[in-house]
Design a protein with these regions (language model features):
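Extreme N-terminal tail/first-helix region
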Residues: 1-21, 145-148
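Short beta-strand-initiation
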Residues: 18, 31-34, 62, 112-115
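Hydrophobic residues embedded in beta-strands of well-ordered beta-sheets
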Residues: 31, 45-46, 125
Length: 156
C-alpha cells in the first residue's frame, strides 16, 4: 500500500461517520463559518442541508470551501447535488440515513423540495492518526506521511 492509499484508508477510519467540521464559505469576499455534520465517502464529504440556507446559497455562488476541526483541515469544491430522493442520490442517501440515523428524519423533511445534499470534493488536506500526520493532494493523488502528535490543550 503506497502513502496515498494509506492516507485514504486513514480518512475512512476517521471520518466515515457523523463528524462535525467548521465549514467555511464566502460571498463577496466575506468569509462565513458554521459547524456542520459531515460524512466521508470516497474522497468526498457530504452535508445534509436546505437549499435556501446561507451555506448552500454561498456554495452555489462560490464552490471553494474549507473544513476544519482539531487541526484537521481540508480544502475543496462544494456542490449542491440536489434533493435526497433524486435517483442519482439513492446510494448516498441510504448511507446518510444510516450514519445520521439518530437525527436524520427528526431534523429533515424529505417532503420539502428545498432539502438537499452538499458534496465536497477534496482538493487537499491535512489529518493525523496514531502519531502519523498526512498532507494530501487529492487531485495529484500524492501524500506525505510524517510523525505528528496532537499536543494542543483544548479550552472549552
Amino acid at each position: 500500500m503506497n502513502t496515498f492509499e494509506k492516507a485514504l484508508k486513514t480518512l475512512e477510519e476517521l471520518f466515515s461517520r457523523d463528524y462535525q467540521f467548521a465549514l467555511a464559505t464566502s460571498k463577496d469576499n466575506i468569509p462565513s463559518v458554521r459547524f456542520v455534520d459531515t460524512f466521508y465517502d470516497d474522497v468526498r464529504f457530504y452535508i445534509v442541508t436546505y437549499a435556501k440556507s446561507q451555506k448552500t446559497i454561498e456554495v452555489e455562488s462560490n464552490c471553494n470551501v474549507s473544513l476544519c476541526n482539531k487541526l484537521y483541515r481540508f480544502n475543496g469544491k462544494a456542490y449542491n447535488i440536489g434533493h435526497p430522493v433524486k435517483e442519482e442520490n439513492k446510494e448516498i442517501r441510504s448511507k446518510l440515513i444510516k450514519v445520521f440515523e439518530p437525527w436524520y428524519f427528526e431534523h429533515n423533511n424529505e417532503d420539502d423540495e428545498n432539502m438537499c445534499y452538499i458534496k465536497v470534493e477534496l482538493d487537499n488536506g491535512f489529518f493525523y492518526k496514531d502519531g502519523t500526520g498526512y498532507k494530501v493532494n487529492f487531485a495529484s493523488k500524492k501524500a506525505e506521511e510524517f510523525p505528528f502528535d496532537f499536543d494542543i490543550v483544548m479550552i472549552e
